[in-house]
Amino acid sequence: MKHPQSVCYEIKTNLTPERLETINKYGCCAFVLLWCLGIEPDDLQAILLVNDMMNAGVIEKDCTVHWAEACRFLTGREMAVEFKDIKSLYGLKDRTPVRYDYKGKSHWVGVVRGMIGFNPLESSQCVEKGRPVSARLLKLK
């Protein structure tokens, strides 16, 4: 434990119930981006970091990620982002954001060495019943 009261104050002043609900429902992509960049704070700090990214405009109010801008915000480095349609996880070696789709819904997970290495949810129907459809290949410029 470090400064729980300070964290409580930060949450109260920076996260409206609406913002927290948006991050809860749609923040998977942002959390996966953090993981793929090797940024692995505790869960509370991750939520606060996503909120900071929204305030900075590198993530939209609906949690849509502006990939290159978000990478620069988080790392201070320029990154190229390639959008790639996929049908399987095969061949994805480095940490890669991957979107799964199922019945009109989507969910993002982090993949490494062809396997899911990080899922921001304990379980997801999109992952369990759906299929991978899209990846974001992140490369330092």
Residue spans of the language-model regions?
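Active-site-adjacent structural segments surrounding the nucleophilic cysteine of cysteine proteases
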Residues: M1-I59
